[in-house]
Amino acid sequence: MKKLIIFIATFMMVSSIQAAEKLDLEDITSRCFTASYVSGVNPIEGTDLYASISNDGSQIVSYSFKTGKQVTVLFDAAACKAPFESVDGYELSPDGKRMLILTKRKSIYRRSFTAEYFIYDIASKSLLKLSDGENQQVATWSPDSRHVAFVRENNLFITDGKKEVQVTNDGKFNEIINGIPDWVNEEEFGFNKAFAWNADGTALSWIRYDESKVKTYSLQLFCGQKPALKQYADYPGEYSYKYPKAGQDNSVVSLWSYDVKAGKTVRMNVPLASDGYIPRVKQAPDAKSMIAFTMNRHQDELNLYSFNPFTGEAKLVIKESVPKYVKEEVVEWTRVGNKYILLPSDRDGFMHLYLYDIKGKLIRQVEKGDYEVTDVYGMNEKTGDIYFQSSMLSPHDRQVYVAHANGTTERLTDARGNNAAIFSGDYRYFFNTWSSYSHPYVFTSRTNRGKVVRVLEDNKELLDKVARYNWGKREPFSFTTSEGVKLDGWMVKPVDFDANKKYPVIQFQYSGPGNQQVKDAWSTGSMGNGGAFDYYLAQEGYIVVCVDGRGTGGRGAAFEKCTYLRLGDLEAKDQVETALYLGGLPFVDKNRIGIWGWSFGGFCTLMSMSEGRPVFKAGVSVAPPTNWRYYDTVYTERYMRTPQENAAGYLTNPIERVDNLHGALLMCHGMADDNVHPQNTFEYAEALVQADKDFKEIYYTNRNHSIYGGNSRRHLLRQIVNWFNDNMK
């Protein structure tokens, strides 16, 4: 009887596996498994409404946070006979009477873009071009809704819709930039607008970048396909831009203000070293005061200065100084309100929130414990409630919390996994996005006490589709290395997994500072972070594993910052230790373990394959930095200081370790990668040649760091699969 039951169960399992639909690479790259989103949510200040662009892009509509139902159509391209069919973005004026509408958006770098802007009057339904000039950037309303500031060709302009005033005249490509960041500040400080209005719209302050002494990097461009750059049909061309590499000259930055009424420009006397940074300028509640953020080049000190935009006088408000470096998130998450400044800091070893009054006096630490604040949503100044996301329950879990003025903290979300929030402009409601390893995104509308009002989207259709493909599950696990370090990870096994067999393993990792790949969250991406590509590899018969080593986020400053001054050393050791641990499992073939990664993950792949212990049979490195001297100042020096200060640390790189490389290696790089230049792979390939090492390399014409466009991504993924199949099966 037992044999019969076992036979029936086995037969049913095999039949289920055979009946399941098979993944192919086209499914992955054609967005077949893309989740449905409640996207483009822009809360309307002071209300419980939000605005969003319609699916076809032709309308901008307001909805209720509470009900999710449409309230009114704010803009209709057809109704106002707009000279365009779809909208790429918009901004409501502070008084709610007009809108800035942008179309014909063209990307420049990761966050920057040009567009054509229009001013739309909601009551009269009239539509006017913002400016007759082209290539406008970051158009922004003044607080009094009377003016719009924008950038064109590196110069600042102000217009009221009728008269246009050019605020700066010295802007020039690759020399002087006004009001938008240079490449490295945009990329590493995460912003694309370097100006702000004062509280009543009578002054405009901006950051000026003099990049004339920054060295130029040139990317070679070819005709290519999809799209074809026909200007390079016969001869290749170049795109040259300023890119400061570690230890080299940065842009010289300064802060300026323009008096709108007087038409006068004044330089602000904000203290700053000649090689320092101004990563933000923000509005303050008083029209005669604004806030400038400054950092030293080592990035271990952040200063907030209050400055008078009319006189240039500046006063230090807050000084934040922590061991090793101030994390980028501190700049991004700091909130300046009417009466307060909310500052994140890991000064006590974990990222927490600190509340100051507007003059810089510390009121209190908002919350504390051995966990991390992982996002900041803001503060309701009427109630004193502060809303944030945290890993309070586990480094791999994210929940939404409120910290009340009386010092108590309340959890607003319930399901374990990954929770995020968007709050209404009056903080009465929020949209909660939840997902887990096994469940795609669920969007709910909730009250500010966490009560679910309604489910907006549950992605049941996607969940059913995934079930038809019989995806495996991401199984979390932990182990302790030979150095006594506890590491966490997940693995995906083949659906027909048999514990009595020996399976090949592919380790995917990113491993970069503060990054987390091991989180209880949904992913269907095509870059190996627990998404569809991992399930495809499992379908091919591999166990796919991801482990976050030392230097990654979610576990406090000691764990994250221990890689300081020696990027790649501990990270590689932890990936090798992962392979050794996996090789000891009864169902793993220790002689068939591979590793791959992208960007920092590509770097760590090379470092791991040359760590000294030959545990990897094969590896794939995509767009890797191979020597930190080739990467930009802001990112590299944050973790490594300069090559002049840390020569030994910079020698910890794949090129210096090339003689130790073991395993079959495939390298892939986009030829137009403006972030991690193909120079990195060129130089490493030359080192491999001189070391007489066999390898394979593939370059993607005119593709950037994401290697996307045309058939590029599908081709790349197929090369990765083929490489592991050819070398590990």
PLM feature spans:
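Predominantly five- to eight-bladed beta-propeller fold
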Residues: 31, 68, 104-109, 113-116, ...
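Beta-strand C-termini and the immediately following turn/loop, strongest in propeller blades
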Residues: 51-57, 62-64, 92, 99-111, ...
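Signature of short aromatic-glycine-proline-rich micro-motifs recurring in repeat-based ectodomains
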Residues: 36-41, 85-91, 180-200, 280-281, ...
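Short loop/turn segments that connect beta-strands within beta-propeller blades
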Residues: 65-68, 121-125, 160-163, 259-263, ...
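Serine-hydrolase catalytic core recognition
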Residues: 28, 287, 419-729
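Non-catalytic accessory segments flanking enzyme active sites
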Residues: 38-42, 53-60, 72-74, 88-91, ...
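Blade-loop segments of beta-propeller domains
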Residues: 69-101, 106, 127-137, 321-324, ...
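Asp-box/WD-like beta-propeller blade repeats and closely related beta-sheet repeat scaffolds
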Residues: 111-158, 163-194
